Amino acid sequence: AASASRVHKEMTKNKPTHNAKESYNYFLATIFPHDEMQIMGYNRVVKDLCGLSDEQFISKLKRNFDIQKLSNKRSPKERFSFTMLLGNCWYCLTAKQQIIKEDSVLRLDASILQHHILEPILKIEDPRTDKRIDFVGGIRGLDELERRCSSDAKVAFALYPVSIEDLLR
């Protein structure tokens, strides 16, 4: 909606004969009941560990996460946990209670990942502009994370999908 608003503003500025009937005056929207919606996970791959070895990286993660090595790949099973692919091994990272905030935005798994892994450990301050991180839609599955980690990425994080209720808060 914000980008549509910017387009509208730019178009009206450049058209002195604006009459409010142009197509850029309209924004298509649709409404669905929240209980009929599903949000898929939105995963991340990172190209390097910011100079850390795998062992150093895992050691830093242990400050804020309980870590369990998995025998097989799997998606996270609940909020406040991620699955991580590092060095051909899958891990489950579960956030320790001390980092789970009451604030509805800071409680989101994406915020926990950003504030406790990406920014402080991997030095990714702005994931929208940093060239070292990429986003992988959940529809592409864990196989895509494995493919990326065998080609151009060092570590991958699979996130539990945010609920509609959390999104609306």
Question: Which residues make up each language-model segment?
Answer:
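Surface-exposed, charge/polar-rich loops and edge strands
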Residues: A2-R169
